[in-house]
Amino acid sequence: MPSFDVVSELDKHEVQNAVDNAIKELDRRYDLKGKGTFEFKDKEQTVMLTAEEEFQLEAMLEILRLALVKRKIDVKCLETKDPYASGKEKKQEAKFREGIDKDLAKKIVATIKDGKLKVQAAIQGEQVRVTGKKRDDLQEAIALLRTKEFDMPLQFNNFRD
């Protein structure tokens, strides 16, 4: 039976490159030169933004978002927390989300069922497996999911006949 998986994955090398580009851009910006830092933690997939003032944090976050877009990484995967004061400086944490949580998986399954397509969707950990009798039905399911707006970027892989 033909099937495919709906996943939400990040290319970790591209994320690292985007953060490196944001660091270089921060050094080039005259208004932010020497006033802020990006600290990327590879294991946790988080970026700690540090600046003197809160408006500088907002500008740094915008630099990071632009760097992600240039590297073709969807900014929906970036989850930011509220800024907080730490001594004389302000800090803000940004986390890269990966994987489909249960709530999003349920929305995906409900969307497929509401589409009344001849496919079945099953939640398997951090992915959703969609199976059907015909390849065309699966392609319709992919088209349906692409038209909907979800709070995470979705990829379709492991397409099997």
Curated annotation (Swiss-Prot):
Entry keyword annotation includes Nucleotide-binding: yes
Transmembrane parts of this sequence: none
Gene Ontology, cellular component aspect: cytosol
Domain of life: Bacteria
Record-annotated disulphide pairs: none
Keywords: Nucleotide-binding
GO MF, one example: nucleotide binding
KW Ion transport (keyword) present: no
Membership in a protein family: Belongs to the YajQ family.
PANTHER family in UniProt: UPF0234 PROTEIN YAJQ
UniProt-listed NCBIfam families: PRK05412.1 (NF003819)
Functional summary from the UniProt entry: Nucleotide-binding protein.
Name of the protein in its database record: Nucleotide-binding protein PP_1352
Organism: Pseudomonas putida (strain ATCC 47054 / DSM 6125 / CFBP 8728 / NCIMB 11950 / KT2440)
